[in-house]
């Protein structure tokens, strides 16, 4: 059940679900697995906020175990294309595609709360069917791995070889380690300073 916020005005009381109220403050959330439905909602919110005010920052809070690479890339591409800066804030866990999206925020505005965790790894895939179908899926997963590694290298300043080695298995980082790695820019304990 979503919490409801009641606002009073000269025209009476209005009830909003909490996420709609926060959207008015340019705050959006990725708090689940990344899938096509979540990507559609986040892309729509970013496009709405860009149309509303192309100069004012968007805050994207991330607490996600990851999910679909293609859905995540749709969110990422939109983050890169919209005019407003996208501030990313990790609360809880940003893992896999969640960590990738966290690192894709505007340079200098990628943040994490002190007790959050960040985890990077290579894309996961499973293939079944005839040998030819498995080969097609294997080529696609290798393409996605190279794409993600290249973009992570670009956002972190690490070389591709290091990214490839570090994402070979689950690689967990504290917020401070994520700063040193280049995944984020700052650990914040007071969100009012954003």
Curated annotation (Swiss-Prot):
Keyword NADP: no
One example of a Gene Ontology biological process annotation: protein quality control for misfolded or incompletely synthesized proteins
Gene Ontology CC annotation, any one: endopeptidase Clp complex
Catalysed conversion reaction: Hydrolysis of proteins to small peptides in the presence of ATP and magnesium. alpha-casein is the usual test substrate. In the absence of ATP, only oligopeptides shorter than five residues are hydrolyzed (such as succinyl-Leu-Tyr-|-NHMec, and Leu-Tyr-Leu-|-Tyr-Trp, in which cleavage of the -Tyr-|-Leu- and -Tyr-|-Trp bonds also occurs)
Subcellular location: Cytoplasm
EC number from the UniProt entry: 3.4.21.92
Major location (coarse): cytoplasm
Subunit organization: Fourteen ClpP subunits assemble into 2 heptameric rings which stack back to back to give a disk-like structure with a central cavity, resembling the structure of eukaryotic proteasomes.
Protein name as it appears in the record: ATP-dependent Clp protease proteolytic subunit 3
Organism: Prochlorococcus marinus (strain NATL2A)
Gene encoding the protein: clpP3
């Amino acid at each position: 059940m979503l919490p409801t916020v009641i606002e009073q005005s000269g025209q009476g009381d209005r009830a909003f679900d909490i996420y709609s109220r926060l959207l008015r403050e340019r705050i959006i959330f990725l708090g689940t697995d990344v899938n096509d439905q979540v990507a559609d909602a986040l892309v729509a919110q970013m496009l709405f906020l860009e149309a509303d005010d192309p100069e004012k920052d968007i805050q994207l809070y991330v607490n996600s175990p990851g999910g679909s690479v293609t859905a995540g890339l749709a969110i990422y591409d939109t983050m890169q294309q919209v005019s407003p800066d996208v501030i990313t804030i990790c609360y809880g866990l940003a893992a896999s595609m969640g960590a990738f999206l966290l690192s894709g925020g505007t340079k200098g505005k990628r943040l994490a709360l002190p007790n959050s965790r960040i985890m990077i790894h290579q894309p996961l895939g499973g293939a079944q069917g005839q040998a030819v179908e498995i080969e097609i899926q294997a080529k696609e997963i290798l393409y996605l791995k190279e794409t993600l590694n290249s973009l992570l290298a670009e956002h972190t300043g690490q070389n591709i070889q290091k990214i490839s080695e570090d994402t070979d298995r689950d690689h967990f980082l504290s917020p401070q380690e994520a700063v040193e790695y280049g995944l984020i820019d700052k650990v914040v304990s007071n969100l009012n300073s954003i």
